[in-house]
From Swiss-Prot:
The lineage of its organism: Eukaryota, Metazoa, Chordata, Craniata, Vertebrata. PROSITE patterns: EXS, SPX. This is Solute carrier family 53 member 1. Residues 439-642 form the EXS domain. The keyword Zinc does not apply. PANTHER family: SOLUTE CARRIER FAMILY 53 MEMBER 1 (PTHR10783:SF103), XENOTROPIC AND POLYTROPIC RETROVIRUS RECEPTOR 1-RELATED (PTHR10783). Residues 1-228, 297-309, 384-388, 472, 535-553, 626-695 are cytoplasmic. Keywords: Cell membrane, Host cell receptor for virus entry, Membrane, Phosphoprotein, Receptor, Transmembrane, Transmembrane helix. The modification Phosphoserine is found at S667.
Amino acid sequence: MKFAEHLSAHITPEWRKQYIQYEAFKDMLYSAQDQAPSVEVTDEDTVKRYFAKFEEKFFQTCEKELAKINTFYSEKLAEAQRRFATLQNELQSSLDVQKESSGVTTLRQRRKPVFHLSHEERVQHRNIKDLKLAFSEFYLSLILLQNYQNLNFTGFRKILKKHDKILETSRGADWRVIHVEVAPFYTCKKINQLISETEAVVTNELEDGDRQKAMKRLRVPPLGAAQPAPAWTTFRVGLFCGIFIVLNITLVFAAVFKLETDRTVWPLIRIYRGGFLLIEFLFLLGINTYGWRQAGVNHVLIFELNPRNNLSHQHLFEIAGFLGILWCLSLLACFFAPISIIPIYVYPLALYGFMVFFLINPTKTFYYKSRFWLLKLLFRVFTAPFHKVGFADFWLADQLNSLSVILMDLEYMICFYSFELKWDESKGLLPNDPQEPEFCHKYSYGVRAIVQCIPAWLRFIQCLRRYRDTRRAFPHLVNAGKYSTTFFTVTFAALYSTHEEQNHSDTVVFFYLWVFFCIISSCYTLIWDLKMDWGLFDKNAGENTFLREEIVYPQKAYYYCAIIEDVILRFAWTIQISITATFKPHVGNIIATVFAPLEVFRRFVWNFFRLENEHLNNCGEFRAVRDISVAPLNADDQTLLEQMMDQEDGVRNRQKNRSWKYNQSISLRRPRLASQSKARDTKVLIEDTDDEANT
């Protein structure tokens, strides 16, 4: 692998601009070589003057790059030293509290089960657990910084060697010895010391001297491109997807030849439609994950996943393929139910029962940690007013807004099984009389409207919670207003349908109100998508017309196509309303069934650019690992952090807002731990690029 490819594969994406610009240096060298005057045409002195002038410019650029790297390394090292001192303080506090409460000197001498502990002991146990996670993330940040150090030194060595080879000189090697090999980012070995001290603290204080267990906890995933999935996972993905395609073809033939024309299929379609949308969502999320990783968008950090253990795109494809097979088999079983001894109504219950069991399965199998993470996230989403809202929380709630059809179909399934299903018929899910009125359509319309509003309500109260935490009307209250338009749209749609069924004279009034609020909602959400969620139409976009100053994905056409797609699908309701008002209700149901997968696709496209925008915000803050602390932030710090996160133009301005940090000096007392021989004071000067600390 060429070094340029190696560098691109192993850099920390959030620090991309802080690495040596290796490709730019290569272009300079090759351009100088191509444009150099020929000795055959001009005299030798002219050629020498040309290369002397080029070398002066080249080494000036090298000096700027070296200064940039030194400054950034010094800042991140100072940040790491402060963080280490803070973690030691928190650890020492936990040790002191435990010694006072139990009289023991280590964390592992007390082995009572968690559910037998007192409230104070439970809090202490949770603090220790948080400390282990915090040290694990801190260790990862140290490895990233060490990797930054090594890659930049190797980059200088490679490009200066290439300089000497092209120009047939040794001045590049001399410059490296004089400048690079004495540069603070290379000579400072404090990062190695911090790594050793962190390993010692985790081993002696948190893992009771078990170094093997400590290093397993601190294990860092490969710092490079996505590692190839295990062979069996790849095999299962191919197998499941192949079977799923074959079963879908079989379903089409079965539907044509097995379904009777005198039976209505809408109950069956509405019961199985939600399962298909969920499978589509999982498959497209796998494509999202693959695309993020290829483009360098750090979704693991954005969602605050465990970098040592998370699902790859291959795993998501595998789950989607497996559930897709079950969905096809269940639907095929319904088609062939007359020749089976099992009643038709059992198959949907078995399918969705298995899906629920797969999610809540308490055994540590089938991606236990990922399923547990999702369950915790769902709990946080549905209890939004009582928790601080993070990115993953409102991202999942946004996904639910595009999957509201699943909730509506679930409500319909419960109603159908409760009131419409004829349990004594073998074809209970395929009623005989297509003209027979649908009891659930009338009985549960108010309930269906409430269910349809649930996802928007979740995002609405999340916005109110964020306003409560930050006291910033923009963007949180404005965003809440966006989701409130859904309530009006659904309400007037329900009133229109109800009054139309009863032939009320005021039906047309509710129809126009419904259309009016649909227009308001679509315009509101479209503007928010493009401007706030995606960060497009930036006035400082420069050559990226109508986009933003910095883009991650390689082709501008992706962005323009996404804008057009979002506009079309945000206003696709106009087709559905027109057809529903003109033709029979079942025609409207057909359109709704077609548009539901398209809305999932729209959210799939939205995900790419929403996470890109968040990734660029992290780049603006040079944030590469999760921020985990046992000690809670005070109100002022929390408000400041929220304001930085929500700043619309944060990618550019956050670096300006950081300037207040550079002239501070911070003195922190490191407490004495068993893994250290004596207490030390560490004074960190952030503006000092030689990284020497007074100890």
